[in-house]
Amino acid sequence: MTNAIDELQAIIAELKTEVEEQRAVIRQSRDRIEHMSAEVRMNIVKNYERIRDKTVAIVGVGGVGSVTADMLTRCGIGKLILFDYDKVELANMNRLFFTPDQAGLSKVEAAARTLTFINPDVRIETHNYNITTIDNFDNFLNTITGDGTVAGEPVDLVLSCVDNFEARMAINAACNEKCLNWFESGVSENAVSGHIQFLRPGDTACFACAPPLVVAENIDEKTLKREGVCAASLPTTMGITAGFLVQNALKYLLNFGEVSDYLGYNALNDFFPKMTLKPNPQCDDRNCLLRQKEFQARPKPVVVQEEAPTDEPLHASNDWGIELVAEDAPSNAPTDLSQSTDVGQGLRLAYEAPEKSSAEATQAATAPVDDTSLEDLMAQMKSM
């Protein structure tokens, strides 16, 4: 028995050594490979390596949150902070992230293991608790304001991937208090629609500015759940929503493109509504009202007038003699290209419109006008 244990320990030690060697190779290859090289070469994203200096907090590691964490890890994010208090169940296997062997583990622990395997350079910090309780809310608040890439600095972005309004209100209260930008996301109960929303305290509406009826009426969500009925879950809708969320998060973190304030998705007719929600001056969140005053007091950005483009040609050389003309400009192209000296020999039109003869033109111009009515013509035809 002792020999068998020793052999297993030796095998485990050998596997650990092999894994460490593979991780070292991954680190070396990652330094040589530039993330999103196509976007960098095409001048879409400048200095993409800044992604390694960013910290993102993800609240909720379920259907949307787990895929979001996976995408950010593959993009090379510097640090991820995960919040969730639930465990992996076999019912979660229709998601895109968890596997059956992880059943029973906390979602943050299972996610950390998988994400570390995908990209060992990403720092993963996990918190297995419910942020809506008083003590845990204080811990959550301290974490997002002091556990950034630099110790004592806030995170760069908070992503809400929770499935209940109570947690959304807690995130909203924390971000309003600390003036942190955050994204809210969600999938409908029937799993055929989803949305993302970018919330900037004071600039756009917070989650309490136009709350759902459940929140406005202080209704306990637990009383609304029907026994034996759970929310539908489609990995397609969750994957699409997570893709929108990460895409806009990257645009915000790396400062490229246009970040959507609100982007919806309806799978039944592929409808993508976009809008911007203004803050409510009578919001119930006092920190939201404070942020609105601060935003209004900020100096307005100076709009720089762009110089009108000149009419000079973009390229000095024009070896092929290509010219642009207005659509309504008369065409001077000859009907018979063989007689033209401006084009290569052997070219001809695929279709040459026949020219009207002088006789046809004269007949059309001198055609008699007949004032006979339709009734008279019908009477003449009947008498024939």
Swiss-Prot record:
Gene3D superfamilies: NAD(P)-binding Rossmann-like Domain
Positions bound to ATP: G63, D84, K107, N130, N164
Tree of life domain: Eukaryota
Any one GO CC term of the record: cytosol
Pfam families: ThiF (PF00899)
Signal sequence annotation: none
A single BP term in Gene Ontology: protein ufmylation
Binding positions for Zn(2+) per the UniProt entry: C206, C209, C283, C288
Region described as Disordered: 352-375
Alphabetical keyword list: ATP-binding, Metal-binding, Nucleotide-binding, Ubl conjugation pathway, Zinc
Keyword Zinc: yes
Annotated family: Belongs to the ubiquitin-activating E1 family. UBA5 subfamily.
Protein's name in the database: Ubiquitin-like modifier-activating enzyme 5
